[in-house]
């Protein structure tokens, strides 16, 4: 059978719940487990200036449990979607959960939309993406903007039905994520946008009706993909499919979700062009295509280089190649008369923070890196910290960069060592932190311990200083984003902004108002649920070892204290997940399978900036220096955004029509 299921009957059967009816007890238990994992989330209450609505996750989980008890929820799919939407309302890209029924089918359609301004300054309107392509060719007479979707005003439908589930903390970033991403092809992610994919969720009806301003209508029919990793589609009833996807245990060679093949089947329609096919050939690039250096063709912009970085998801040898490519690119730009640099981080969702720190140090080799983080001081973390801090001492502590729960391993935000004499000194809670119970401030990790020649941070540890003097001054560097910059990308932009580097961002909601360059998560560290399970497992082993040690046997008071910690750990900890995705039954302590692809996570640590050391950076609004709306040319030829950004940021107003939206001046 084709991986792409277009039969409407299949979709309707799925929607009607024939695919699976779920055991209420299991899903109620799932909500209980989610609440235990939720206690690891670091952020507290947001200040009034925070743009996104806040959500009480524990209260939301309680309401879901009540719906299970009173029979309001009738299927596993309904339950999983409710839980997914609740988690999404936190608008925290580090807070995610992979739920079994949502991994079975992925719904999408082939009519992406885009938001286009005629000149980059007038308010944009919604168009079918293919119409934007026609607009760029100059044939505008027959083109009409989209005004309604399923009887609702189009922008309202998109923002209230879809954008709210996308996990970005900024509403403009969520809006941009609805539409095609030209950089998605570099990282192998879906390129048509969340309106076309609906985050894989059933959109609520088998037909979506688009109405245009000229009165014409277009019917869009969602289809379902069957991931090849789910194996053959040979299930004859919903119960069998439910058991394969959601219950531990299988007699087949491969576990559901682990069959060889692509994560998603190829759709039956053409996706918007993305990645290398839509950008010019770079002067320099790495083997993964994540780092690319360009020169601008415009005669007036020959002194501008563009360094495009689409992801920081890498490690090991890829990190070393990344570092070498950045150095080669900056050296080439400087030696070829480039005095200005555009750093394009559009669509960059983050990844490994070490390459991000390395990038900053190559741009500003004379500036030390400051990082400030805190975790929530909870009972469970206290137990883990006591277990790790008692076990790892001296040289041993240097070997455990993660978890950051050994006091001996922690350094100050300015990288001072030996500042925490005990676990209590690190755990706190900090008496100067108002409101929430938070740890004392400390760095992401020790750069001296983390930086190696294999995975370098320039000038730290065993990694030499790759570039010894600045090649570009702050006023000659500008960061370009689409607001979706997240995690490590956010950390890099924050470090650059602290040096005076300016930012320019494209798109966003159709309103003449500021927009943030960093609209994604600005947390200090993401922990996957498997990481949490691994740390809990290790802590149990350490405490059991301490409990039976010779020292404990000789000291009944110490043995009693360790036994108390071990009991508390067992009481507070969530059930373990398999430490390797899709492991066999004996690794499960939970009745339902979830996190099939290992993507579930929480934000373990908050990040802070020197100007405000008590409000998590996630909640601080930072408008870009310049905002532009996308023109048809910017949509079809995304490299044209670099010309617009360079003229606005480096050339001043006198260079012509390339201006920022008029709420702000450069």
Curated annotation (Swiss-Prot):
Region (Peptidase S41 domain): 303-504
Signal peptide: 1-27
GO biological process: proteolysis
Keywords (A to Z) from UniProt: Glycoprotein, Hydrolase, Protease, Serine protease, Signal, Virulence
Pathway: Mycotoxin biosynthesis
Family matches, as Pfam families: PDZ_CPAF_rel (PF23658), Peptidase_S41 (PF03572)
Enzyme class: hydrolase
EC number, UniProt record: 3.4.-.-
Residues bearing glycans: 70, 214, 234, 555, 612
Stored InterPro entries: ClpP/crotonase-like_dom_sf, PDZ_CPAF-rel, S41A_metabolite_peptidase, Tail-specific_protease
GO MF annotations in UniProt: serine-type peptidase activity
Function: Peptidase S41 family protein; part of the gene cluster that mediates the biosynthesis of the phomopsins, a group of hexapeptide mycotoxins which infects lupins and causes lupinosis disease in livestock. Within the pathway, phomP1 and phomP1' are probably involved in the processing of the phomA and phomA' precursors. The pathway starts with the processing of the precursor phomA by several endopeptidases including kexin proteases as well as the cluster-specific S41 family peptidase phomP1 and the oligopeptidase phomG to produce 10 identical copies of the hexapeptide Tyr-Val-Ile-Pro-Ile-Asp.
Family from the record: Belongs to the peptidase S41A family.
This protein's name: Peptidase S41 family protein phomP1'
């Amino acid at each position: 059978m084709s991986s792409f299921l277009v039969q409407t009957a299949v979709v309707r059967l799925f929607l009607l719940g024939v695919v699976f009816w779920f055991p209420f007890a299991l899903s109620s238990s799932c909500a209980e487990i989610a609440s235990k994992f939720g206690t690891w989330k670091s952020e507290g209450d947001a200040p009034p200036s925070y743009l996104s609505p806040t959500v009480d996750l524990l209260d939301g989980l309680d309401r879901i449990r009540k719906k299970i008890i009173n029979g309001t929820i009738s299927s596993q799919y309904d339950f999983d979607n409710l839980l997914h939407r609740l988690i999404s309302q936190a608008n925290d890209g580090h807070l995610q959960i992979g739920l079994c029924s949502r991994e079975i089918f992925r719904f999408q359609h082939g009519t992406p939309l885009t938001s286009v301004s005629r000149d980059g300054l007038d308010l944009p309107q919604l168009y079918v993406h293919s119409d934007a392509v026609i607009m760029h060719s100059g044939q505008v007479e027959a083109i009409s903007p989209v005004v309604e979707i399923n009887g609702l005003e189009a922008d309202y439908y998109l923002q209230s039905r879809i954008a709210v589930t996308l996990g970005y903390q900024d509403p403009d970033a969520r809006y941009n994520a609805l539409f095609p991403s030209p950089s998605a092809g570099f990282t192998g992610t879906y390129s048509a946008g969340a309106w076309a994919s609906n985050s894989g969720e059933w959109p609520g009806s088998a037909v979506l009706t688009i109405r245009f301003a000229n009165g014409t209508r277009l019917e869009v029919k969602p289809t379902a993909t069957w991931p090849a990793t789910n194996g053959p589609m040979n299930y004859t009833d919903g119960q069998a499919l439910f058991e394969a996807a959601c219950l531990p245990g299988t007699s087949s060679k491969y576990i559901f979700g682990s069959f060889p093949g692509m994560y998603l089947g190829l759709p039956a329609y053409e996706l918007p062009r993305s990645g290398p096919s839509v950008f010019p050939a770079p002067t320099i690039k790495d083997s993964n295509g994540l780092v690319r250096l360009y020169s601008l063709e415009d005669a007036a912009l020959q002194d501008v280089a563009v360094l495009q970085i689409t992801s920081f998801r890498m490690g090991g040898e890829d990190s070393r190649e990344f570092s070498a490519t950045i150095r080669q690119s900056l050296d080439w730009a400087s030696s070829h008369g480039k005095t200005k640099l555009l750093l394009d981080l559009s669509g960059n969702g983050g990844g490994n923070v070490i390459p991000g720190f390395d990038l900053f140090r190559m741009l500003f080799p004379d500036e030390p890196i400051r990082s400030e983080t805190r975790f929530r001081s909870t009972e469970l973390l206290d137990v883990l910290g006591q277990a790790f801090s008692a076990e790892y001492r001296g040289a041993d502590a240097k070997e455990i960069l993660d978890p950051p729960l050994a006091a001996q391993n922690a350094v100050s935000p300015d990288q001072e060592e030996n500042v925490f004499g005990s676990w209590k000194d690190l755990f706190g809670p900090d008496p100067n932190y108002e409101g929430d119970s938070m740890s004392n401030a400390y760095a992401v990790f020790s750069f001296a311990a983390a930086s190696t020649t294999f995975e370098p941070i320039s000038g730290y540890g065993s990694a030499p200083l790759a570039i010894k003097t600045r090649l570009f001054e702050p006023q000659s560097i500008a960061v370009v984003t689409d607001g979706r910059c997240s995690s490590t990308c956010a950390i890099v932009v924050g470090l650059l902004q602290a040096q005076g580097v300016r930012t320019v961002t494209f798109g966003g909601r159709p309103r003449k108002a500021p927009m943030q360059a960093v609209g994604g998560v600005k947390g200090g560290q993401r922990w996957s649920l498997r990481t949490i399970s691994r740390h809990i497992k290790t802590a149990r082993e350490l405490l059991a070892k301490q409990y039976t040690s010779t020292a404990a046997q000789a000291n009944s008071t110490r043995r009693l204290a360790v036994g108390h910690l071990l009991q508390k750990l067992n009481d507070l900890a969530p059930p373990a997940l398999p430490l390797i995705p899709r492991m066999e039954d004996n690794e499960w302590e939970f009745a339902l399978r979830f996190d099939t692809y290992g993507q579930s996570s929480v934000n373990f640590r908050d990040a802070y900036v020197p100007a405000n050391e008590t409000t998590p950076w996630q909640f601080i609004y930072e408008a870009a220096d310049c905002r532009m709306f996308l023109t048809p040319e910017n949509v079809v030829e995304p490299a044209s955004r670099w010309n617009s950004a360079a003229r606005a940021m480096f050339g001043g107003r006198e260079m012509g029509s390339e201006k920022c939206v008029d709420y702000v001046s450069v």
